[in-house]
């Protein structure tokens, strides 16, 4: 039976804890195309109607730092598409989804409305960005990106996670509820539109397991490094809180999450190797796995230094 006990930091106020050091076996690299930052700053300024105050506030979250480490091999044109779609997602989530200002009816309109007929800023921008992707990417991979954005947005607007997650949720139950929440599959799809992965591979059991551990790993990275930011909120959309309610110790819970992240990295490696052994001649698959690993190591790195997570 689910126990809907809310988190209350006051119950653990006397506990000291430190964020654990996570041993990542994946390489890390930064993108050399740092000049694209000027394009992002200009785009964000236009997005906020040339409001310097609003654009500075958003840019202060250092999202470009996230992109530089998460997508180290993206070309300037690709990086421009990536920052636009990811910034679009961050902003629409902050403006509409988290505040519950928009629901499923808006979401259906967003994905079905012709941008030329819509007066809504987010709808118009979304399809403009997708059209930019079409200039450089593969149709099937862009379709995957659109589907992943929809899955993320649907998860965000439904907010069903608050009802499904309870204080006695297992990690598997927690992941089932939060699978699309942080948008990590969407982020990977945004950076792999230049390559095509055959349907046979995408639907294989090993590929789905690789994706699962990729999501587990990155969701828990988010939970670990967002805990300080979220610790005063009563909701249980952070596994550190759930584990603490179960065991009584914040430090023990953080250590458990760190250990699970490291185990997830091992699972990612194992399933990656199995896929490459099964499809040894598929160069695109190797590139996809490379992107997945660098996105993970980049996410881990920026989570400890980026203002968006503080």
Swiss-Prot record:
Give the gene name. Answer: TPS6
Instruction: Name one matching Pfam family.
Output: Terpene_syn_C_2
- Its source organism is Dictyostelium purpureum (Slime mold)
Comment, domains: Contains several highly conserved motifs that are important for catalytic activity including the aspartate-rich 'DDxx(x)D/E' motif and the 'NDxxSxxxD/E' motif, both of which are involved in complexing metal ions to coordinate the binding of the isoprenyl diphosphate substrate in the active site.
- Could you tell me which InterPro entries the record lists for this protein? Isoprenoid_synthase_dom_sf (IPR008949), Terpene_cyclase-like_2 (IPR034686)
Motif DDxx(x)D/E motif extends across 93-98
Family classification: Belongs to the terpene synthase family.
Q: Which UniProt keywords apply?
A: Lyase, Metal-binding
GO BP, one annotated term: terpene biosynthetic process
List the SUPFAM superfamilies hit by this protein, alphabetically.
Answer: Terpenoid synthases
Keyword Ligase among record annotations = no
Q: Which reaction does it catalyse?
A: (2E,6E)-farnesyl diphosphate = (E)-beta-farnesene + diphosphate; (2E,6E)-farnesyl diphosphate = (1S,2S,4R)-beta-elemene + diphosphate; (2E,6E)-farnesyl diphosphate = (3E,6E)-alpha-farnesene + diphosphate
What's the protein here called?
A: Terpene synthase 6
* GO molecular function list: metal ion binding; terpene synthase activity
